[in-house]
């Protein structure tokens, strides 16, 4: 199974850091991820530090990364503000 572009596998999770243009843009990005996560009932770990958002996808019940996490990581990239 491949890792989506821009993501890395770390500690049984898919991880990516995003640097947004402002704090409000970072919060809007997180809101979009939250909408996606709620629609799929699969939720990432999120860390917000000013303009930087770190997203971690894993399936705790599976003990690591699943195909669902790979799909959600790829879909998260589509949430990025342009």
Language model segments and positions:
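Short, well-ordered beta-strand elements within core beta-sheets of diverse protein domains
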Residues: 13-21
């Amino acid at each position: 199974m491949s890792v989506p572009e821009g993501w890395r596998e770390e500690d049984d999770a898919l991880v990516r850091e995003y640097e947004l243009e402002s704090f409000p843009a970072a919060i809007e990005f997180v809101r979009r991820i939250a909408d996606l996560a709620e629609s799929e009932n699969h939720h990432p770990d999120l860390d917000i530090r000013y303009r930087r958002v770190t997203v971690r996808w894993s399936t705790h019940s599976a003990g690591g990364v699943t195909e669902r996490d790979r799909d959600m990581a790829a879909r998260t990239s589509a949430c990025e503000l342009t």
